[in-house]
Structures are given as C-alpha cells and as structure tokens.
Amino acid sequence: MRVISRARSACTWTSCTSLSPCSTSCPPSPAAPTLLRRRSLPQQRRRPSSSPNRRVRGVTTSPCPTRSLVYKRRVGAPQRLCAETVATMQAQEANALLLSRMEALEWFKKFTVWLRVYAIFIFQLAFSFGLGSVFWLGFPQNRNFCVENYSFFLTVLVPIVCMFITYTLGNEHPSNATVLFIYLLANSLTAAIFQMCSESRVLVGSYVMTLALFISFTGLAFLGGRDRRRWKCISCVYVVMLLSFLTLALLSDADWLQKIVVTLCAFSISFFLGILAYDSLMVIFFCPPNQCIRHAVCLYLDSMAIFLTLLLMLSGPRWISLSDGAPLDNGTLTAASTTGKS
C-alpha cells in the first residue's frame, strides 16, 4: 500500500511505501496530520489510563492550568480545590471574619442606644407612677372627683395631643432635656389626678397590665422585625384575642353604657399598642444616638395613653354606677359626705 503526500508550492511528488518511511524536506500537507491522528488514535485508546489524577490515601493531585489541583475527600464525594481557589477561600474567610467583627461593633453601638432609650423611658414611667401614688395617698377625700366632673375625662386626650405633636414634627422635633420634662410633667399630672379617682386594686391592675403589654409588644417587635409574615401571624393572633375579649364583655350582665365604654377602650388600647409596636421598631432599627430622648418620649406617651385608657376602662363602670346613685364601698369617702359632715 502506498501513501502519496503532496508537497506545497516548492515540493515535488514523492512516493513511499508503508514499510519505508517517507523522508522529505517539504512541510507536511494538511491531510497528513489528519491521517497521522487517525492512526495514532487507536494507540491512544489502547494505552493504559494515564490520567494525571492519582489518588494516594484520599488525596489526589492533578495539573492545573497554572498551578496544581488538589482533591480532598470530605464526607463522601471529594471536593476539587485549586491552589488559587484555596487562597481565594482563605481571603474570603478573613474578610468574613473582619465583617463579623464590624457587625459586632455595629450591634454594640445599637445596644448602647437601646440602653439609653429604655433607661430614659423607665425614668419617666417611674416618675409618673410615683407621683400618682403620692397623690392617691395624700388626697383621699377627692376619691370621688371624677364622678362629679365628667369633663375631666377629656384629659385622656393629653398624651394623644403630645403624640400628634411628636409625629407631626418627626426628625425636626427637638431632643433635649427641656422637652423631656415638659412632656413628663404634663402627662404625670394628668395621670396623678386620674389615679386619685381610682381604687387601689384598679391602680395595681393598671400598673401590671401596662408593664405587661409594654414588655410583650417590645418583645414582639424584636421577634417580628421586618418580616411581614411574622407580623401577619402576630396580627391574626391578636385579633382573635381581641374578639374573644369583646365577646365575653358583650355577653356579660353589665349595663349597655358600661359595655360601650369597655368596647371603645378596648379598641383604643389596640390602636395605642399598634403605635407602640411601630415606635419599638423605630428604636430597634432607625434610632440615631442624637435622637434617644425623642424616641424615649414616644414610648412614654404610648405607655401613658395605654395606662389612662386602662384606668378609664376599669374604673369607668364604677364611676357611672356612682353617678346613678349606687352606694359606695366601705371606707370610700365622697365629696358630698365630707361636705355634709362639715
């Protein structure tokens, strides 16, 4: 069998046999490499697998385009790691560690802001409750003041007006000690007069319920965060609880006027709790260090509105019954009895 290869421009035709290899100075034709590749292909297939991947006790090495590849066996399938990839991963781990440190520092700054806000809030709430207790103990003869003066119920609007001012001004609202004490005195006096008209068990119950609601909704604000699904679940649970409470209140044997007062107070408390949750989210995520007083005042106004509404809901039915001529409890003094004795 003869193989004829054609030389290019300056080459001549040469003939050779399969037994004697061709020797010519001409460059090989384009068909020659193809023929050679076809001949060498079976030889390459018959060669033993010369794969560069050679495993030695769970570690296999193979050439990389630039550097060597390293295979490491981990929990089943081996993971392919190049030297450059290893270096990149180490750099990413270092960056991740640095980022976590920065996040920790940022979280610590937020934590200090939270401490400032809630410390100011606790001071305001303690001052208001303490002043109210002093008024309640110092003026027992005015225990029936709210029964004779229905117009005093309008003082419940004091924290609502303060809330309207703070939300209207927004970030332009001043955040200093002067503003803090103005809001503190205005709401503390209102709460103190309201407490004079209430019984001791009603006061203690209002204190406990206000603190419990504040702690609960602050915890829900941390739990819900910015997740809408969680807030939907929280809202559904709260609506079910509210409807259950209203059903029990409406099915009771109380007067229809008392039922109306309880229903209105329940909806008002729900509204204030929603504002409290919103203010708590603002403190958690969007409170700068120079606005701590303003955010603490917002939380304080929300809590005072809830407290006064609870007092009105728990003491309102009794005030209504007293105004209709119902007998007073033992040990309760009224303005009329005091005037008659004098």
From Swiss-Prot:
Keywords: Glycoprotein, Late protein, Membrane, Transmembrane, Transmembrane helix
Major localization listed first in the record, in broad terms: membrane
Bias type Basic residues, positions: 36-48
Entry GO terms, CC: membrane
Region described as Disordered: 21-64
Spans through the membrane: 119-139, 150-170, 177-197, 202-222, 231-251, 266-286, 296-316
Protein origin, superkingdom: Viruses
Pfam families reported for this sequence: Bax1-I
Membrane topology: Multi-pass membrane protein
Residues with glycosylation annotation: N149, N176, N330
Compartments in which it is found: Membrane
Family that this chain belongs to: Belongs to the cytomegalovirus US12 family.
Protein name, UniProt field: Transmembrane protein HWLF3
Organism: Human cytomegalovirus (strain AD169)
Lineage, highest ranks first: Viruses, Duplodnaviria, Heunggongvirae, Peploviricota, Herviviricetes
Gene name of the record: US20
